[in-house]
């Protein structure tokens, strides 16, 4: 009901109403008008509604424009026609309707690979555009809008819209004579649209996505489809990132990736620190256990990561020839039966037995000088025997008082695969095939041969003898001698006197021995040091001795005795030295030492010459 009819009713005779009834009736009319206008606005925002298209003075239907509802909110014969390019923002809790008439630029920038740059993916240009919207433009991606309403017709507050250079047409005072256009069906989406890039955090599109996620996604897909169809992509001919080297790819990763890696390394470092603390607590408890039990005469074992681990085969530590014969002649079951029957029979010492006794004496001396010392020899018994055979081995170890706490019984499986897990520094076995397998794994290994049983060895001093070439040093001198002769080799070595020799497989073990020797030297125990090293080489001191000694000096290593034989036999020297083990690469010298009763080891040259 209009205001004119209200005045007529007020002037008619017989219509006497109080001021309160008139005010109540006005409020009812205002409420009805507000409800009607809100319903019309809701229909106008609907994308399928007929008011979605806007006929205005010859202006054809534009999918980027939205015609507001026609109503009587502002009085009769007043029509609201507002053509807007909607971009909703949410700022400080208020909805702002941005009226824009901008249009995308037809020319899109691409990078070196032909992809659109990030700013080109945005449908709204950062700089306002005054170009009029085209008829062929796709329909607006936004399907929800808030129109500004009068304070008298709407109880919800709204702010005035912000305009760009192209302002909307003025309000018309005449109602529209054209019928509303029929609703247009939305275009079908592409079957496999490409994934749009990640939007900027401060962009307006994120606000649209929060307002209406479904409509925002449809608008993005239409935009990508239009961009892809309008201009083909041109790809650069540079090779992919995966083809580049790792050094070239480092610059491609963003800083966030580097931060993630740094944080990951910090986590790993923290985890290692926790593991170290747990391990330290465990070994502290082990030490307290040994100290609180006077009946336990065995000292606490060293930490594996700090110790010098020597892995021994059971055949190198004990004499197991009889059991080996039974296994080869009668099979595994008879061998197992034989070992179980004789598990209380103590095994006789093998070729590495005296070597182990000398290692234990060095550990005892180090514990006397350094009670908390962890840099000790740790012996591991490694065998492919069955676990039941281990009972006889344990009984024999305890009978001789050997401090061997770690066993590896693989039950017929090759134990070479466990060497690295045990942090092995040196592997000694009686089987040359096992030694070659360990060498292929990169572990210093040697085959130990037994000497004369009646020869006396010193148990209070560890004596280790090394050959020079292919043992402490590389085998390049042997190859040079074979190719050019001995005279040329002497001349070459004299010219290269100041050039250090390349390291050999046993250089690391000599470093370990030297590190332990320095612990005794620090306590003024040089003359009473329980470790003594020997260099027994066929080189000539006059021609190549200086280069050998300078190489050891360059490495920071000391050798107690250097014996240059100039091609003479080594066996008489080894008999005089009586080393617990002699590392040599030539089988001829080992056989000679074996005949004279010296314990020798072989098996190094294959690693460096192959």
UniProtKB/Swiss-Prot annotation:
Any one GO molecular-function label of the UniProt entry: magnesium ion binding
Major enzyme class: hydrolase
Biased composition (Polar residues): 119-132, 236-265
Activity regulation remarks: Activated by ADP.
Chief localisation class: cytoplasm
Protein name: Cytosolic 5'-nucleotidase 1B
Low complexity: compositionally biased ranges: 148-166
Function: Catalyzes the hydrolysis of nucleotide monophosphates, releasing inorganic phosphate and the corresponding nucleoside, AMP is the major substrate.
Originating organism: Homo sapiens (Human)
Compartments where found: Cytoplasm
Keyword Mitochondrion annotated: no
UniProt biased composition (Basic and acidic residues): 9-34
Domain of life where this protein originates: Eukaryota
Compositional bias (Pro residues): 167-183
């Amino acid at each position: 009901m209009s205001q004119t009819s209200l005045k007529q009713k007020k002037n008619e005779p017989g219509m006497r109403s109080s001021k309160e009834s008139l005010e109540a009736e006005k409020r009812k009319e205002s409420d009805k008008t507000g409800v009607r206008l809100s319903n019309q606005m809701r229909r106008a925002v609907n994308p399928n509604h007929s008011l979605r298209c806007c006929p205005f003075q010859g202006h054809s239907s534009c999918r980027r424009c939205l015609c507001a509802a026609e109503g009587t909110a502002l009085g009769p014969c007043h029509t609201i026609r507002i053509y807007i390019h909607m971009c909703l923002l949410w700022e400080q809790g208020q909805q702002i309707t941005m009226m824009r008439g901008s249009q995308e630029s037809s020319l899109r920038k691409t990078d070196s690979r032909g992809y659109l740059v990030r700013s080109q993916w945005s449908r709204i240009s950062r700089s306002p555009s005054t170009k009029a919207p085209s008829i062929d433009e796709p329909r607006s991606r936004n399907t929800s809008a808030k129109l500004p309403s009068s304070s008298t017709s709407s109880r919800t507050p709204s702010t005035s819209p912000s305009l760009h250079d192209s302002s909307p047409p003025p309000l018309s005072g005449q109602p529209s004579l054209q019928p509303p256009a029929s609703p247009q069906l939305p275009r079908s989406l592409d079957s496999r649209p490409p994934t749009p890039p990640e939007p900027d955090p401060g962009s307006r599109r994120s606000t649209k996505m929060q307002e209406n996620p479904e409509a925002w996604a449809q608008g993005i897909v239409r935009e990508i489809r239009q961009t892809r169809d309008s201009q083909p992509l041109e790809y650069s001919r540079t090779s992919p990132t995966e083809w580049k080297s790792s050094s070239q790819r480092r610059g491609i990763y963003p800083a966030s990736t580097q931060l993630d890696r740094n944080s990951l390394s910090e986590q790993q470092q923290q985890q290692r620190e926790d593991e170290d603390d747990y391990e330290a607590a465990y070994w502290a408890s082990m030490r307290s256990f040994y100290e609180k039990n006077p009946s336990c005469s065995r000292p606490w074992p060293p930490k594996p990561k700090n110790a010098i681990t020597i892995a021994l085969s059971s055949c190198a530590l004990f004499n197991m020839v009889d059991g080996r014969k039974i296994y080869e002649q009668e099979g595994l079951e008879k061998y197992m039966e034989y070992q179980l029957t004789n598990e209380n029979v103590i095994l006789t010492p093998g070729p590495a037995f005296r070597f182990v006794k000398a290692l234990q004496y060095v550990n005892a001396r180090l514990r006397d000088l350094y009670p908390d010392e962890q840099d000790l020899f740790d012996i591991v018994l490694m065998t492919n025997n069955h676990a039941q055979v281990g009972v006889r081995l344990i009984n024999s170890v305890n009978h001789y008082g050997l401090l061997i706490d770690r066993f590896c019984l693989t039950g017929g499986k090759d134990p070479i695969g466990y060497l690295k897990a045990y942090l092995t520094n040196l592997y000694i076995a009686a089987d040359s095939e096992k030694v070659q397998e360990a060498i292929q794994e990169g572990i210093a290994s040697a085959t130990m041969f037994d000497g004369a049983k009646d020869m006396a060895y010193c148990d209070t001093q560890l004596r280790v003898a090394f050959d020079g070439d292919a043992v402490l040093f590389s085998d390049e001198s042997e190859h040079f001698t074979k190719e050019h002769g001995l005279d040329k080799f002497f001349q070459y070595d004299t010219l290269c006197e100041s050039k250090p020799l390349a390291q050999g497989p046993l250089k690391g073990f000599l470093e370990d021995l030297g590190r332990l020797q320095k612990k005794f030297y620090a306590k003024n125990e040089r003359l009473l040091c329980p470790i003594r090293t020997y260099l027994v080489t066929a080189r000539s001191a006059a021609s190549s001795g200086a280069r050998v000694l300078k190489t050891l000096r360059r490495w920071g290593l000391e050798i107690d005795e250097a014996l240059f034989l100039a091609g003479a036999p080594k066996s008489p020297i080894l008999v005089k030295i009586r080393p617990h083990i002699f590392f040599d690469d030539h089988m001829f010298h080992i056989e000679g030492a074996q005949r004279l009763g010296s314990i020798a080891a072989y098996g190094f040259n294959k690693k460096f010459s192959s």
